[in-house]
């Protein structure tokens, strides 16, 4: 599907779920190269910047966070591609990332030059990373608060999902930072627009901050997850130790009374008060075993 928007300085074609007819239109009418279109529509393409002076086109592939359809609090990254050709802007992305386009339409001015407009969009994309990282950090803190009371598998799974999301987010911030560094170098060489150069410099600062936020948040989450797993393992070890000790102690009455259940002659077996002696012997043996285990720090 192709949505057309017109601003005061350029035409914008927003492309999602490209079909064969629309692809042919872009190839023939707008003279977009087949290879360029393949890169622009590749959902696994890494973030990068390319400039084609012969074709008079620029392509910017930027990774943005994308929420999972079934689990809105889990995130991956998805590319959004901007192609500038002959003062026409083409954007290629999935339906799941249409939220950023809607935000752009609602907030950005329509009298900006096309290159400035794209830089402003990238700035909004970087700011979106900040919001997602803060959201994931808040979720993590909520799970940790619950873990302080009782460790449950549900909280551990939640921490694992946050950790996985942060891995994707960190990867996205790092590749975007490489893209922006390349963009900064090319614009410094080719552009005389000081406002754009300042905007790119600001973008770099925000992108570095997003990368650092993602690194710190991921590191904290990994450490907390490891600590929680260790505590869970320790609790399991304590439970197994408790069961083992009491299994051992509780075998003593069975062994002691078992002797007097055999059809053999034993001391005091004819005495009606022998059961009291058996109980005392059993209790003494149990106390001795408990003392031995505690002395050697088994319990």
Task: Give the predicted meaning of each segment.
Residues 1-185, 192, 202, 206-209, ...:
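Peripheral, non-transmembrane regulatory/ligand-interaction domains of membrane transport proteins
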Residues 143-146, 150, 176, 180-183, ...:
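Hydrophobic stripe of amphipathic alpha-helices that form coiled-coil interfaces
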Residues 155, 192-195, 217, 222:
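DNA-binding recognition helix and immediately preceding turn/loop
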